[in-house]
Amino acid sequence: MIQPQTRLKVADNTGAKEIMCIRVLGGSRVRYGRVGDIIVASVKEATPGGQVKKGDVVKAVIIRTAKEYGRPDGSHIRFDDNAAVLIGKENNPRGTRIFGPVARELREKQFMRIVSLAPEVL
């Protein structure tokens, strides 16, 4: 469950380390973001020489949440952290690598490029 002001780890090599959610996209009444949702965020921490700088406003897709969520088969899944991947035009990732596992729900939401770059899909 990601809402405005939530801080997330960045799980790619764009140079951003931490972002803060500004808005969950998808209508005026969307309060929380789940895995696969797109958010608008501000870069709060970045490495020098990266693609993005501190203060940049970026779009990102949520790939992991610490709050568990149910799947249609009755199982539940949760992760150790809240993490996102920065995306650009046409929802393609801005980085060339993704760190850590990603959820299977990203495949259903058509983020195939992120799924293919991920080391593990849970």
Swiss-Prot record:
State any single GO MF term.
Answer: structural constituent of ribosome
Claim: RNA-binding is one of the keywords in the record: yes
Its GO CC terms?
cytosolic large ribosomal subunit
Q: Could you tell me which InterPro entries the record lists for this protein?
A: Ribosomal_uL14 (IPR000218), Ribosomal_uL14_bac-type (IPR005745), Ribosomal_uL14_CS (IPR019972), Ribosomal_uL14_sf (IPR036853)
Q: Which UniProt keywords apply?
A: Ribonucleoprotein, Ribosomal protein, RNA-binding, rRNA-binding
Is RNA-binding one of the keywords? yes
General function of this protein: Binds to 23S rRNA. Forms part of two intersubunit bridges in the 70S ribosome.
Quote the protein name from its UniProt record.
Large ribosomal subunit protein uL14
Q: Which organism is it from?
A: Chloroflexus aggregans (strain MD-66 / DSM 9485)
